Regions:
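Glycine-rich portal/gate segments that line the openings of hydrophobic small-molecule binding cavities
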Residues: 33, 64, 74-122, 178-187, ...
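Short, well-ordered alpha-helical segments
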Residues: 52-59, 168-181
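Intrinsic-disorder/low-complexity, polar/charged segments enriched in Ser/Thr/Lys/Arg/Asp/Glu/Gln
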Residues: 37-45, 82-84, 113, 125, ...
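Beta-strand/loop substructures that line and gate deep hydrophobic ligand-binding cavities in soluble
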Residues: 117-171
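Beta-strand elements of well-folded, non-transmembrane domains
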Residues: 46-50, 89-93, 106-110, 122, ...
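Soluble, non-transmembrane catalytic domains of enzymes that act on hydrophobic metabolites at membranes
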Residues: 128-129, 172-176, 193-196
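Hydrophobic ligand-binding cavity/cleft-lining segments
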Residues: 2-82
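A short, structured loop/turn motif at beta-sheet edges
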Residues: 50, 75-82, 107-113, 131-147
Length: 196
């Protein structure tokens, strides 16, 4: 039994929190990062269809092929819409390379949201969700059909290095969502090439 919520917040409520400046950022294909100190929202707009986007978000076994710091990824357990994923993460921090193994529980809801939480890893806690929502044409333009977003809460016990952790985590969030959008768009382009 999962401890994750199966509730999907209505898109209207979710998107109503965005300002006109936020929509302008998304319309320019920039990454929108909001929040701080361990509580973040990150969002991008993309022209891909929801099916392609969902396929990328749930391609757990292949995260290492397109996520920047993931060097190994595998499904440990899968049952219905619940999947346990283990990833080996490798990144440069200052003058050294740091590796960590992270195990997450992921709960897929209505092909629109993936709620996740950390089961094992080097953080005190991490939980949140990925979402796919239709992009309002009037706000982001005709070129984007879909909004891909992640809400995440994360905390690490790093003592006096907490601000450095937050900076690294924020950079990682932006790099990850850029890589996910790039993979979605690569797959959509490959699919179009096959069709023509």
């Amino acid at each position: 039994m999962s401890l994750l919520s199966r509730q999907v917040q209505p898109a209207e409520t979710y998107l109503a929190k965005l300002t006109s400046a936020d929509w302008a950022t998304l319309a320019k294909r920039r990454v929108l990062l909001k929040g701080g100190k361990g509580k973040y929202g990150v969002m991008v707009a993309t022209p891909v269809d929801a099916e392609t986007a969902w396929a990328v978000l749930t391609d757990y076994d292949n995260f290492h092929r397109f996520l920047p710091t993931v060097v190994e990824s595998r499904v440990i357990q899968s049952e219905g819409g619940r999947t346990i994923v283990e990833q080996l993460d490798r990144r440069r921090i200052l003058l050294s390379t740091v590796e960590s193994t992270v195990r997450t529980e992921n709960l897929e809801i209505d092909r629109q949201q993936i709620s996740f939480r950390l089961l094992e890893g080097n953080l005190q806690h991490m939980y949140g969700h990925w979402r796919l929502d239709a992009a309002p044409e009037a706000l982001v333009g005709k070129a984007a059909h879909l909004l891909v977003s992640q809400q995440v809460h994360a905390e690490a016990d790093v003592g006096p290095f907490k601000s450095m952790f937050y900076n690294l985590f924020e950079t990682s969030l932006v790099d990850t969502v850029k890589a996910i959008r790039a993979e979605m768009e690569r797959r959509a382009a490959a699919s179009e090439t096959v069709k023509s």
